[in-house]
Amino acid sequence: GRTTVFDDPLRPGRRGSELLPIILETHKPEDLIILMLGTNDCKTFYGATAGSIGLGIRKLVRQIRDGAPSAKILLMSPIALGEKVWDGFDPEFGKNSVQVSKELPEIYRQIAEEEGLYYLAASDYAVPSERDQEHMDEDGHKALAEAVLAKISEIL
């Protein structure tokens, strides 16, 4: 998965702040950009707080404004991690990762308000699957897709 601003020591080329300018340049013109990153920033080896992840999101918002100044921005906070994501599912996460992931919606909401962005909390519509405690199941994807469609219709 991708991160906001962190280099993944196990998977090179995953830092959003490195990839985003290229994506913006190759996808012009942009009417609406949906930004939803942060789950992978919760991995234990980054030691990130929700606030520091928020700083990464702010950097990405600045990059979007620089690369696509006329685009509207929908900031989405990701779903929270499951309570036992580290226990037999994904050892890159720990107990603190779950707590940090639960703090992201409020941080992202504040950023959206301060930056004049549209906002949607994925955790209002979906939860992590029992299968891996990290990703949505089919019902979660469907519920979130319907919410995103409604939000896009409202924005555009």
Predicted regions and their residues:
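Histidine-centered active-site loop/cap adjacent to the catalytic His
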Residues: 132-156
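Surface-exposed helix-capping loop/turn segments at secondary-structure junctions
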Residues: 66-71, 119, 154-156
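Short, internal active-site loops enriched in acidic
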Residues: 40, 79-82, 126-127
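Structural beta-sheet core signal
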Residues: 35, 74-76
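Short helix/strand-capping connector loops at secondary-structure junctions
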Residues: 122-132
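Substrate-gating cap/lid alpha-helix
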Residues: 81-121
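Alpha-helical structural signal in soluble globular domains
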Residues: 59, 63, 67, 103, ...
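Conserved SGNH/GDSL esterase-like catalytic core that processes O-acyl groups on lipids
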Residues: 1-63, 69, 84, 99-103, ...
